[in-house]
Amino acid sequence: MPSEKTFKQRRTFEQRVEDVRLIREQHPTKIPVIIERYKGEKQLPVLDKTKFLVPDHVNMSELIKIIRRRLQLNANQAFFLLVNGHSMVSVSTPICEVYESEKDEDGFLYMVYASQETFGMKLSV
């Protein structure tokens, strides 16, 4: 069974900052993204990994397709990807724009996924 701790709980702030520094140094055209299942989610499976290096030209719809495929979801299964646990962004937005406006102080871009919309509710990640 996967760990119940979030990425932020498993790694100190300093470790995360160093992770991002190394990632950006070695992969300057990749965006460091952490994608975790919403803590109250029961229907969708847990991803096999949480850390993703996403090419900076990819838009949100492509990222959603990638995550849906990794989760092996069928076309009629609902799936919502929330940036910083609270905001949905336009599917046409490039990930590099989302990163610039929404990245955490540690340098990672955090997202959670859920099977239901959670508008008006701040999700803790």
Swiss-Prot record:
Post-translational modification: The precursor molecule is cleaved by ATG4 (ATG4A, ATG4B, ATG4C or ATG4D) to expose the glycine at the C-terminus and form the cytosolic form, LC3-I. The processed form is then activated by APG7L/ATG7, transferred to ATG3 and conjugated to phosphatidylethanolamine (PE) phospholipid to form the membrane-bound form, LC3-II. During non-canonical autophagy, the processed form is conjugated to phosphatidylserine (PS) phospholipid. ATG4 proteins also mediate the delipidation of PE-conjugated forms. Phosphorylation by PKA inhibits conjugation of phosphatidylethanolamine (PE). Interaction with MAPK15 reduces the inhibitory phosphorylation and increases autophagy activity.
UniProt KW keywords: Autophagy, Cytoplasm, Cytoplasmic vesicle, Cytoskeleton, Lipoprotein, Membrane, Microtubule, Mitochondrion, Phosphoprotein, Ubl conjugation, Ubl conjugation pathway
UniProt-annotated site: Cleavage, residues: 120-121
Keyword Membrane listed: yes
Lipidation, Phosphatidylserine amidated glycine type: 120
Membrane topology classification: Lipid-anchor
UniProt keyword Mitochondrion present: yes
InterPro entries for the chain: Atg8-like, Ubiquitin-like_domsf
One GO-annotated biological process of the protein: autophagosome assembly
Disulfide bonds: none
Chief localization: membrane
Lipid moiety-binding residues (Phosphatidylethanolamine amidated glycine): 120
A cellular component annotation (GO) from this entry: microtubule
Residue numbers covered by the propeptide annotation in the UniProt entry: 121-125
Source organism superkingdom: Eukaryota
Subcellular location: Cytoplasmic vesicle, Autophagosome membrane; Endomembrane system; Mitochondrion membrane; Cytoplasm, Cytoskeleton
Subunit note: 3 different light chains, LC1 (a cleavage product of MAP1B), LC2 (a cleavage product of MAP1A) and LC3 (produced by one of the MAP1LC3 genes), can associate with the MAP1A or MAP1B heavy chains. Interacts at microtubules with CABP1 (via EF-hands 1 and 2) but not with calmodulin. Interacts with FYCO1 (via C-terminus). Interacts with TP53INP1 and TP53INP2. Interacts with TBC1D25. Directly interacts with SQSTM1; this interaction leads to MAP1LC3B recruitment to inclusion bodies containing polyubiquitinated protein aggregates and to inclusion body degradation by autophagy.
Family as reported in the entry's similarity comment: Belongs to the ATG8 family.
Function: Ubiquitin-like modifier involved in formation of autophagosomal vacuoles (autophagosomes). Plays a role in mitophagy which contributes to regulate mitochondrial quantity and quality by eliminating the mitochondria to a basal level to fulfill cellular energy requirements and preventing excess ROS production.
PANTHER family referenced in this protein's UniProt entry, alphabetically: MICROTUBULE-ASSOCIATED PROTEINS 1A/1B LIGHT CHAIN 3-RELATED (PTHR10969)
Protein name stated in the entry: Microtubule-associated protein 1 light chain 3 beta
Upper taxonomic lineage: Eukaryota, Metazoa, Chordata, Craniata, Vertebrata
Gene behind this protein: MAP1LC3B
